[in-house]
């Protein structure tokens, strides 16, 4: 399976756009900020993410899916959860831009 699915992010001051990357370049001209992509080894085509949720300790999380690479093929599509981090100027990112194999878990008290 050759899946080039990725999660990217852009911003706009207007709901109708234009949406731009971190450098202010138009996303419609293939400019965007990468949040998540496959690692080429274990995870293929991560994407279809949900909204970012915040747990009771103030940590942000993103739910998405990714295909598991197995025996030269695809072992199935799995639900995934990763911690979202933020740059100093407010752009979201996932550590190393790839799905994690292990990570902290969200904390919910109720």
What are these regions (language model features)?
Residues 1-110:
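Carbohydrate-active catalytic/glycan-binding domains of CAZyme proteins
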């Amino acid at each position: 399976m050759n899946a080039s699915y990725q999660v990217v992010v852009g911003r706009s001051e207007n709901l109708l756009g234009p949406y731009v990357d971190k450098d202010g370049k138009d996303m419609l001209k293939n400019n965007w900020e990468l949040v998540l992509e496959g690692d080429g080894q274990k995870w293929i085509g991560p994407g279809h993410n949900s909204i970012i949720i915040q747990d009771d300790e103030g940590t942000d999380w993103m739910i998405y899916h990714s295909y598991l690479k197995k025996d030269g093929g695809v072992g199935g599509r799995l639900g995934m959860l990763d911690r979202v981090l933020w740059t100093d100027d407010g752009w979201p990112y996932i550590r190393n831009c790839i799905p994690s194999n292990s990570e902290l878990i969200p904390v919910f008290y109720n």
